[in-house]
Amino acid sequence: MALDETLFGYPIYPKFKLGEPRFPQDTFLGRYLHCLDVIDPRTLFASNKKLEESLELLNSFKAGTATNVPDKSLWEAQKLKSAILHPDTGEKVLPPFRMSGFVPFGWITVTGMLLPNPSWPTLLFWQWMNQSHNACVNYANRNATQPQPLSKYIGAYGAAVTAACSISGGLTYFIKKASSLPPTTRIIIQRFVPLPATSLASSLNVICMRWNELETGIQVYEKDTGKVVGVSKVAAKQAVTDTTMVRAFLPVPLLLMPPCIMPYLERFKWVTKTQVRHIFVNAIVCTLSFAVSLPVALALFPQESAISREQLEPELQQKTKNSLLYYNKGL
């Protein structure tokens, strides 16, 4: 691959900039291409040695001692660092809770939530599994500039899971009790129950798991110097709001596509001949839908978001002359 090759008009490996995304973040397409880097599952297989080599290369570049190193190598090193280490703490994120592990480790729960005609225990079990995974991902990818005690996150986890199971169980109960609906209509509607349940529950999950940020605020900084100006509750509100919108949108294509696609595939006898085959095909459709919807949802807002100085608290406005300040939105 030629290094000057372009992708949708963007250079695939532009001049390397330390700490900057490979693609522009002021357009949806640029953010989408960046998110494909963020969720690349190949980074899950990187060894500790490979990570150390990447960090050494980036440190050498920062010190000005990395000479004749291709931009591609520098971008790949930064991609690996961003995929594995938390941007605020610098600590490793466990593979199941990285964005690159969201689909490989989350497809099982998504498939389980979309199983046809689930029993009450099955329904609640998969909602619990899904929201437990979401809660761990939210915690692992939070803005960590203001440390919080683990006890607060445990309480938030309980609230998120309770909300998810209550919403899903409540919707299913009312549909089953809707005797005026024909049985076929009830079955079709029941296939789409996970959509509003998961969308609402995922939004509440983010709010619960990141409530402490709203109370204490998050750090805002000058992008050109990296100087931390202070801690802002206004920025925290914007960060949590944007992330909540992302999580509310994520289940829409993910949970709409399989119920729309599976009825057509079920016309083939090979698919419905055995329950194992049906579950297998359903799992493939769910996984592909998950892989398609995740980068689209993440690209709605940039991870490193900007906020105008005028929007911040008065005491912070006096500490900088920059018109825009930045913060880590979290994922």
From Swiss-Prot:
Gene Ontology MF terms: monoatomic ion transmembrane transporter activity; transmembrane transporter activity
Pfam family, one: SFXNs
Keywords of this entry: Amino-acid transport, Membrane, Mitochondrion, Mitochondrion inner membrane, Transmembrane, Transmembrane helix, Transport
Protein location: Mitochondrion inner membrane
Signal peptide: none
Main location: mitochondrion
Transmembrane segments: 104-126, 153-175, 243-265, 278-300
Gene Ontology annotations of biological process type: amino acid transport; mitochondrial transmembrane transport
Family matches, as PANTHER family: SIDEROFLEXIN, SIDEROFLEXIN-5
UniProt function note: Mitochondrial amino-acid transporter.
Record InterPro entries: Mtc
Protein name per Swiss-Prot or TrEMBL: Sideroflexin-5
Membrane-protein topology: Multi-pass membrane protein
Record's GO cellular component terms: mitochondrial inner membrane
Enzymatic reactions: citrate(in) = citrate(out)
Family statement drawn from the similarity comment of this UniProt entry: Belongs to the sideroflexin family.
